[in-house]
């Protein structure tokens, strides 16, 4: 039944296949998995795990994949250990109700992959139903499934026996084309497992997988992509009422253009307001899954400003909940690439122009601050360097992805900008987060070509070119030193961050070509 016997899953009490969102909400309510908000969205608590658990993620080390995976950044697990855990997981699923969703990753039909996701929770099946690309196909046992993911939040590993680090484990086995997710209800683990799998598969077909959002001009069809780690603004900035949204997080870049890996969005909703983010706010309705928000027990209104459970409150919804979405999920060659960073030091400019060499430097550097709640244990912003703006999800050597991006930027003469959505006027705790209104104005100016002929000032500490004006943005915030009350303290903080850049690059990329190395900050005494 639904290929379960091939996996060794037998004697389930019920197997529900490709239920509709309404059916899944009914099941989840009946199973006490969550509640409905006043807008009809389904609200759940994910318990202990309110963010990803990167220390609990593993790849099965087999001869077939060993040479392709960068083991300096990814944890291996023995095939025998995986088999033992999988055997116990399969036994655990006996006499349980399970939910199955068949969908696709990759909107370009030439490169699409079929995924089967098996859940013990109806709410998690609702999430992945809304996040992957949905098909109208009925079940056909002859349809090949490219990868199967099994998520069982109530199944716990035993670290001492299973060779993992905690009761939770996210294990991807490329040889068997199976991934398992144990002991965590955080739905993002399913989504990011799909992404990690695609990030391994796609480069073998000369497709650059990217941790980015993308949108498109509805008239010219020119596309822009926004790279960035969690919380830097990918989803927010790509949801632009004047442009068509292609996708908010995961894309591939092939010879003909870009394509979304997904069929939905997964947005942060802490401090969400309709005035500043209307598209996301209005997407929180029936069929959406909301995680870890506080809900008024009487009115059932979501208290978006309340971070008492976690700052990493999230909502998953299908992309057609965004009114101006490009439902094909496909766009042309990007005209503009924007790197988003959330600088908690408060010293990077709000926007700077990058040469192709500087673009390569900042792509492999991937600087940002991990924002509170996005990973287990992160309570306040932590400066981090995440290769390709997505190191936790990139199984292969970073040079693979960097070279592919470099080739494409050069071939298409794509313009690249670095935008800081983090702090201004001081570091985290003293400065303020850059106003979203100003960041949107800068993005609009980039897309309109305003900065092509703007006046620039070179920043010697960070080796960046800073435009001196932008429509809709106060000129005094363009140069970060002007936003600090104490300029000497700014210089000390800026040099500290520049040295972090320098030391990170020197340690990670000693063999990088000199022209790329020289495009970054120099060491400051």
Curated annotation (Swiss-Prot):
Report the source organism.
Fusobacterium nucleatum subsp. nucleatum (strain ATCC 25586 / DSM 15643 / BCRC 10681 / CIP 101130 / JCM 8532 / KCTC 2640 / LMG 13131 / VPI 4355)
At the top level, the lineage of the source is Bacteria
Keywords, alphabetical: ATP-binding, Cytoplasm, Decarboxylase, Gluconeogenesis, Lyase, Manganese, Metal-binding, Nucleotide-binding
Please provide, alphabetically and separated by semicolons, the GO molecular function terms listed in this UniProt record.
ATP binding; metal ion binding; phosphoenolpyruvate carboxykinase (ATP) activity
Q: Which cofactor does it need?
A: Mn(2+)
Coiled coil ranges (UniProt) are none
Q: What is its main location?
A: cytoplasm
As for what it does, the entry says: Involved in the gluconeogenesis. Catalyzes the conversion of oxaloacetate (OAA) to phosphoenolpyruvate (PEP) through direct phosphoryl transfer between the nucleoside triphosphate and OAA.
Q: What class of enzyme is it?
A: lyase
- Residues bound to ATP are 192, 211, 228-236, 277, 314, 433-434, 439
Pathway assigned in UniProt: Carbohydrate biosynthesis; gluconeogenesis
Q: Which BP terms in the Gene Ontology apply to this protein?
A: gluconeogenesis
SUPFAM superfamilies per record? PEP carboxykinase N-terminal domain, PEP carboxykinase-like
Q: Where does substrate bind?
A: 52, 186, 192, 314
Q: Which reaction does it catalyse?
A: oxaloacetate + ATP = phosphoenolpyruvate + ADP + CO2
Could you tell me which Pfam families the record lists for this protein? Answer: PEPCK_ATP
Which parts of the sequence bind Mn(2+)?
Answer: 192, 211, 249
Question: Which HAMAP family does the UniProt entry name for this protein?
Answer: PEPCK_ATP
> One Gene Ontology cellular component annotation?
cytosol
Q: Which family does it belong to?
A: Belongs to the phosphoenolpyruvate carboxykinase (ATP) family.
Q: How is the cofactor bound?
A: Binds 1 Mn(2+) ion per subunit.
State the EC number(s).
4.1.1.49
Could you tell me what this protein is called? Phosphoenolpyruvate carboxykinase (ATP)
> Where, per UniProt, does this protein localize?
Cytoplasm
The gene that this protein is the product of is: pckA
